Amino acid sequence: MIIAIDGPAASGKGTLGKRLAAHYHFRHLDTGVIYRAVAKALLDAGADPADEARAIAAALELDPERFGHPALKARAIGEAASVVSTFPKVREALLTFQRQFAAEPPGAVLDGRDIGTVICPNADVKIFVEADPVVRARRRTLEARARGEEVDEAVVLADILKRDERDRNRPVAPLKAAADAHVLDNSNLDIEAGLKAAIAIVESVRVRSGRA
């Protein structure tokens, strides 16, 4: 079974994906980490994230061992990843890796921005996570401060709105809910409530498909 979770920055899709994968004993891939790893490789090399040729090269040489690096959570890396992800050839280079991951039995949960529309259009379950931008900015600010980063919530909100605009309007694989996705608004849901709602969605699909 493949579960696709999409949504904008700081919507809670990553936490939901991780918890949902643990519940079903499936593998989990936060696809945003892939782009962050590419962005970090560029920044470490002193390259500009807007340098498309360098970004493509970094994507082709991507080392999965870099996925767990704590620095990938930094706001600067996230901003650079948002730029890198707009390049069609970068997305193409990372497509095969993501699809191979999704195909591994017994199942996988992938979260990102184009899982249900591009990476796994035939996923068994598609969930699109939404949340109010102000709520998302607050969550992202608290996460950053918990890591010891000094951040201004107003600046974080501005960054989120800018990323939303970039993600929704990029020419390749724009952020949008798949036509058959279940929309989950977790603006007012805590982690447990969000997980419970997602499990209910998955179980309803399993019942309809005769997998329950």
Curated annotation (Swiss-Prot):
Keywords: ATP-binding, Cytoplasm, Kinase, Nucleotide-binding, Transferase
UniProt: ATP binding residues: G7, P8, A9, A10, S11, G12, K13, G14, T15
Residues that span the membrane, as ranges: none
Name of the top EC class for this enzyme: transferase
Keyword hit for Endoplasmic reticulum: no
SUPFAM superfamilies given in the database record: P-loop containing nucleoside triphosphate hydrolases (SSF52540)
Documented EC number(s): 2.7.4.25
Catalytic activity: CMP + ATP = CDP + ADP; dCMP + ATP = dCDP + ADP
Compartments, as annotated in UniProt: Cytoplasm
UniProt GO cellular component terms: cytoplasm
Keyword Cell inner membrane: no
GO molecular function terms listed in the Swiss-Prot or TrEMBL record: ATP binding; CMP kinase activity; dCMP kinase activity
Main subcellular localisation: cytoplasm
Source species, domain of life: Bacteria
Listed GO biological process terms: pyrimidine nucleotide metabolic process
Family that this chain belongs to: Belongs to the cytidylate kinase family. Type 1 subfamily.
Protein name: Cytidylate kinase
